[in-house]
Amino acid sequence: MTILSEIVKYKQSLLQNGYYQDKLNTLKSVKIQNKKSFINAIEKEPKLAIIAEIKSKSPTVNDLPERDLSQQISDYDQYGANAVSILTDEKYFSGSFERLQALTTKTTLPVLCKDFIIDPLQIDVAKQAGASMILLIVNILSDKQLKDLYNYAISQNLEVLVEVHDRHELERAYKVNAKLIGVNNRDLKRFVTNVEHTNTILENKKTNHYYISESGIHDASDVRKILHSGIDGLLIGEALMRCDNLSEFLPQLKMQKVKS
């Protein structure tokens, strides 16, 4: 069993045990009308748009420094991030919907609920906690699930980042006409990353979609390796959480887009 299938099994058990219904019943609703649109930001931004992540740990990383997360969000905002990603999985990533709820009020930037969504109820909880964007991972969804969840999220006025790991999944993302597509550079079987995976997947990409490179981006040299793939933005977590000088580091990553 891969780590991803293990996580999905865990999410299914949470759904069956009423975890998400309890969250919906107990979390105070956070209004997100003041949130900016990430897609609008991409359209207007001549430089790469940055989704800056709040992350405590992952199945492969356990030694991230503890940060004042309110200050981290403020720094992301101040130094040029275009959106914030907040992990809400408790078991594998030490996140929570309560954390999302507390931090989303600290910024007007779009906030992505990064989780493993397989059911509309999870989308309801994400929205109630104050997310303005959600993540859908093509690899863990059937075509019908992907279409239904995508359309449901859009109907709830949420933006959707559809994540792909290979060219076949990219074609599946095109089928639902996903406007915002994330290319994950992590090998799902071995959980290792290669940033140039983005170049391979986007070699024959379609126009009229926006592309975000995710995972394995540690510095400006990594960004330069994938800039000519025609990406519109980056999702970066670990490198930002480790950085003690965001005022210099974050602007370095916001390179001029290269349209291929």
Swiss-Prot record:
It comes from the Bacteria. It catalyses: 1-(2-carboxyphenylamino)-1-deoxy-D-ribulose 5-phosphate + H(+) = (1S,2R)-1-C-(indol-3-yl)glycerol 3-phosphate + CO2 + H2O. Keywords: Amino-acid biosynthesis, Aromatic amino acid biosynthesis, Decarboxylase, Lyase, Tryptophan biosynthesis. InterPro entries: Aldolase_TIM, Indole-3-glycerol_P_synth, Indole-3-glycerol_P_synth_dom, Indole-3-GlycerolPSynthase_CS, RibuloseP-bd_barrel. It is an enzyme of class 4 (lyase). GO terms for biological process: L-tryptophan biosynthetic process. The keyword Lyase applies. Pathway: Amino-acid biosynthesis; L-tryptophan biosynthesis; L-tryptophan from chorismate: step 4/5. One of its GO terms (molecular function) is indole-3-glycerol-phosphate synthase activity. Its EC number is 4.1.1.48. HAMAP family: IGPS_B. Belongs to the TrpC family. This is Indole-3-glycerol phosphate synthase.
